[in-house]
């Protein structure tokens, strides 16, 4: 059994175990279409493949998701490698800001069309709600992470605090 095949099988077994329907329901919902290359891509890739994909082929939404990425287990050497890759991707200086803003705005419109609401109790999807706050943070991180690495936090509240401290947005806007 080759390394790639082994890790693909291990990943599938892990996914099956956390998504299995039990008497209490499912532990987690996992949408494996949301991975590099979608359903055509492998379930598990090498660190080098992950890095190459993120540098050259990843979509804006994938980098937005990466702003929340974190290593939850594994040896310190592996954690450091992955965190370094994530940091380097998020702080890449060659990002086209106009295109980035357009892509983020387009995604937000698409989400609003599919999940938007006028219900004031829907704190997540209402205009000005949690999703808008997260999109503002994610855009700000991708647009400014090269100049202000201190803003590259995983937690939205910490991101907002660092964005305010760096004076990227005014205190009133934050």
Would you name each region that the model predicts?
Residues 1-174:
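A nucleotide- and high-energy phosphate-metabolite-utilizing enzyme signature
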